[in-house]
Amino acid sequence: MSRFLVLDSGPLGLLTHPQRNADVVAITEWLSRCLLSGHRVIIPAIIYYELKRELLRAGKSFSVARLEAFASRTPGRYLPLSDEALQLAAELWAKARQQGRPTADAKDLDVDVILAAQALSFESAPSDVVIATSNAKHLSQFVTAQNWSEILP
């Protein structure tokens, strides 16, 4: 079954890393297998922003170029942030706090909640969408999220 793999900043950061260390090789091979299996890889706007701002701050222009190229290589890979997703994120954020399960400090933007909302408002059925991450803890209270290395292509 093909799925939509929504990338979190950890895996996306590895994919844009210029050095070929063991983690970069592993995720690059994983991505190739996923694409060959028919999965669609999605880069949500909030994660693009989160990663790009840090790469710019650190002066990593080569990684910025890799990120931009990867995001634009396939039509439909970049998922813009919609009003619908922002509305849903506000509702998820409030509900998590009301239930005593916040995912970030009250003053933080809370990228995880916005990412979850982007995944939930995606065009496909929720069962076809999984967030590929390095830490599924906070995300999994809202949406299907798995460590990228545990997602079978």
Q: Which stretches of residues belong to each language-model region?
A:
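Acidic catalytic patch
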Residues: P75-R101
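A generic structural signal for short hydrophobic patches within well-formed alpha-helices
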Residues: L12, Y48-L51, L86, L139
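Acidic, metal-associated active-site segment
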Residues: L51, K107-V129
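Short acidic-hydrophobic, aromatic-tinged amphipathic segments that line or gate anion-handling sites
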Residues: G76-L81, N147-P153
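Short loop/helix-cap segments at secondary-structure boundaries that form the rim of catalytic
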Residues: H138-T144
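Alpha-helix termini
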Residues: S32-S37, A96-R101, L120-V129, N147
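Short, well-structured N-terminal submotif of metal-dependent ribonuclease cores
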Residues: M1-I43, E54-A71
